[in-house]
Amino acid sequence: MDAPSRSHLASPILVANYRSLPSFMYRDSLPEAAVSPQLLALNTRLLETLEQDLAWFNSSDALEQLSGKTYYGSNLPFALAYSGHQFGGWSPVLGDGRAHVLGQLKTAADELIDVQLKGSGATPFSRGGDGRATLGAVIREYLLSEAMAGLNISTTGSLAVIATGEDVWRNGAYPGAILVRTAKSHLRVGSFQYAAVHQGPEAVKTLADFALAQYYPELSHDENPYQALLAQVIKGQAELVAQWMLVGFIHGVMNTDNSSITGETIDYGPCAFMDEFNPNKVFSSIDSQGRYAWGNQGAIAQWNMARLGETLLPLLDSDEAKALEIAQAQLGDFNRLFAEHFYQGMARKLSLDASDPELIPFVDSTLQLMTNTRVDFCQFFNALTEYHSTHREQDAGLVALFSTEAFPSLSSTPAQLLQDWLSQWQAKACDSQAALAAMIKANPKFIARNHKVEAAISAAEQNNDYSLFLDMARVLANPYVLAEQDKHYQDAPTPDQRVKQTFCGT
């Protein structure tokens, strides 16, 4: 890759407001220009949502900038600095090792949206890495982030996939690519940790004031704005992680440097959606202890929020004991908020009354049924929705999911366990049209099935065939709409298709 040149052609990408921060929070860094860039995917849905000029993003000028070949005027790209706890271990200096912030887009409502290149070459934070990304890793993030957007779960956006025309060496040669990513913010818990450990409380105050002004201006005039900021980030993370779990999503690397202060899902590495249900399920090849398993994600998010609270202590109160008391009170709210979002979400998925005092034990017993029978997560809720929508007359699809032989550890067959559970559910299920509509809306027809994602990646990497990738992106953008030709995306993997591990491929 070559160094980019400066362009004086008009661009909608503005100078990023991060440059108002102290310079220790970022480093100027030029992308390594792609040798032979090719636009493989442009997310017109996202561009329309952000109210951007489609013509410009389809132009050769856009391809030059988004592939790192040029930058506009004095708008020098940069890499953000941050620290992080990675799998619980402290890393004082991390930062964007393979990403460059180009600037920001402005929406019609004057909201600023970050534009970042991922896989665009080495930065001062690369720590010996090449800063590049494989096409497979870029396709994975594009598909998974589109799936989350389609599910109405807060996420960074994938604006474009650009092939670089060069191979990237990992455990072999793979085609290289750049992901153009958008976000409300790229500030993380790790950003506050970096400010605290390297510059101290005044730097944390500067960063917190920036976050309040840019993302939560309504909190700036609060009696204690820093307490309000902590409370808002906690609230956002509690809701976000509950939403992940309600669709069987496992992030895989919930480090503090991957915990957004604006409540967005960020950094899709070894993430995946579950097929058969297992609360202890992990996919990440490096999560050998199961730290970030599906069922641990709420507790880990709270742990990350505690690390944010530690950085804000000097701002919460001048009295250290009182500051700690304030932080602990806010962190104590996490479990309530998380449980509220999770169990109310499960009530919608099961067409139950959220105010039922027996809701929590019944949901827990449902999850135990799913664990014992290893039923497919998404298919179970879809089959139950179909059964409920036919006035509980057509149960063939539901029964078929539990038609396997008895497991040695169970005293009853899966079919018997289902019937026992169904009798309890039928006594509790709400029959109103509103409840059924909420149930349908809570249970997507499609998730980003791992074996389907891998098939799309394989076709692209091995045969330069992007049709599977683009078709899957289309389906995932509308996961509640089932067309006949798309039904195969609902299929669970056969034993030989099952993806057992995922990797941080970028």
Curated annotation (Swiss-Prot):
Q: Where does ATP bind?
A: G95, G97, R98, K118, D130, G131, R181, R188, D267
Entry EC no(s): 2.7.7.-, 2.7.7.108
Residues engaged in binding Mg(2+): N258, D267
User: Does the UniProt entry include the keyword Nucleotide-binding?
Assistant: yes
Q: Does the keyword Membrane apply?
A: no
- What cofactor does this chain's UniProt record say it requires? Mg(2+); Mn(2+)
User: Residues annotated as region Disordered?
Assistant: 487-506
From which domain of life does this come? Answer: Bacteria
What's this chain's function?
Answer: Nucleotidyltransferase involved in the post-translational modification of proteins. It can catalyze the addition of adenosine monophosphate (AMP) or uridine monophosphate (UMP) to a protein, resulting in modifications known as AMPylation and UMPylation.
To which protein family does this belong? Belongs to the SELO family.
Q: What is this protein called?
A: Protein nucleotidyltransferase YdiU
Biological classification of the source: Bacteria, Pseudomonadati, Pseudomonadota, Gammaproteobacteria, Alteromonadales
